């Protein structure tokens, strides 16, 4: 992994981190400095109902400008950033997995080519890492999610970390279905094809 990570920071795994703040309105709120460490992505506010759940019809993107007029009621601000995991590769990104297979695995594959599939019947790969918490992320996830499900994930990010009525289960299932599909396509499909071309079993 270190060989690939040294090539480009694009290969670093990414996670979605958040900071949460509560406010009681009416009050004018400054939004500056409320993002967690990482690359700022979006700020969403939502009103809390009497049970402490989010009211989905109150969701509002307040990323710009840097202040917000909080209405009456108890409101929650979700600030999401994308944070790189410097010692892990992005297993949701096909280009990264391809680079991983080209080096160092291709080096050993070429060196012992005559033994592959016979004296060397199979290959073992160290466990890939896809975070569950913080939430997994990759640069193309937002566009892929929109293509898969027809709505913008960013507008619904609070539902991944807090309940908001009947929409909660759908958004979470949609999110992990897309993450799972991207993981399968980037990692499992490419590694399986790499092994098959060399007559190897994936152990």
Language-model segments: what does each one mean?
Residues 1-173:
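Mature extracytoplasmic enzyme cores
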Residues 1-2, 119-127, 175-203:
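Aromatic-lined carbohydrate-recognition surfaces of secreted/lumenal glycan-active proteins
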């Amino acid at each position: 992994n270190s060989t690939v990570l040294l090539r480009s920071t694009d290969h670093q795994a990414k996670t979605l981190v958040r900071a949460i703040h509560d406010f009681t309105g009416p009050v004018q709120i400054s939004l500056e400095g409320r993002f967690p460490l990482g690359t700022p992505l979006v700020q969403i506010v939502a009103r809390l109902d009497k049970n402490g759940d989010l009211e989905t019809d109150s969701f509002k993107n307040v990323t710009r400008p840097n202040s917000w007029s909080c209405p009456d009621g108890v409101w929650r601000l979700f600030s999401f950033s994308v944070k790189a995991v410097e010692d892990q590769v992005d297993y949701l990104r096909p280009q990264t997995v391809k680079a991983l297979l080209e080096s160092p695995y291709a080096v050993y594959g070429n060196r012992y080519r005559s033994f592959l599939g016979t004296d060397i019947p199979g290959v073992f790969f160290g466990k890939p890492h896809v975070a569950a918490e913080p939430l997994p992320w990759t640069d193309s996830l937002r566009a892929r999610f929109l293509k898969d499900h027809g709505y913008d994930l960013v507008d619904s990010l609070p539902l991944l970390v807090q309940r908001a009525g009947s929409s909660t289960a759908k958004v979470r299932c949609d999110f992990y279905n897309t993450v799972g599909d991207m993981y399968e396509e980037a990692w499992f499909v490419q590694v399986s094809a790499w092994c098959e071309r060399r007559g190897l079993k994936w152990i």
